[in-house]
Swiss-Prot record:
Subcellular localization(s) per the UniProt record: Cytoplasm
GO cellular component, one term: cytoplasm
PROSITE patterns referenced in this protein's UniProt entry, alphabetically: U_DNA_GLYCOSYLASE (PS00130)
Protein's name in the database: Uracil-DNA glycosylase
Species, as recorded: Haemophilus ducreyi (strain 35000HP / ATCC 700724)
Chain's gene name: ung
Amino acid sequence: MNSWTEAIGEEKVQPYFQQLLQQVYQARASGKIIYPPQHEVFSAFALTDFKAVKVVILGQDPYHGPNQAHGLAFSVKPSVVPPPSLVNIYKELAQDIAGFQVPSHGYLIDWAKQGVLLLNTVLTVQQGMAHSHATLGWEIFTDKVIAQLNDHRENLVFLLWGSHAQKKGQFINRSRHCVLTAPHPSPLSAHRGFFGCQHFSKANAYLQSKGIATINWQLPLVV
């Protein structure tokens, strides 16, 4: 199994998925502002192919402010100030990775291109309404994505931050993959153990131990 088409192509023709897409389409057509824009909903899959995935970082649902979400978990468009959770991710990187310099932006596309699947478990949201699309069926779809990675890839690193991601990843085969857990990087919980978790260096140490090229976590300082 080499591509997302092979991995989840059949899922996209399931009735629940067609109904889900129709609900999102109707919401947009009725004038509601839905993030991310339609052409970016599946960006995580377009940028990181199935056979290229090395690390999976699970988010929850997209940012719900203007111009933030573009289809990659935790990432924002280049012109947007990094949100608090991403600021805390950068703080941990600066502690964990020698020489890491905090960029001026929150655009994580360089990670995606190296094999970091930045996957939200719900792929759309209505402006200003967190979790507004949580019951549409996205969770069924992203469960399938994780199951296919679990079953048809090996030696992946899953970074599960917060209880939602940890529950979502509870069935991942720990003998086949590396699963690292920590509190969410949100300001509400980062001090409970996200800071100091060293997940970025641990991910690279695991990849290296399996003979897999590591991730360069350093992002361009400006974009």
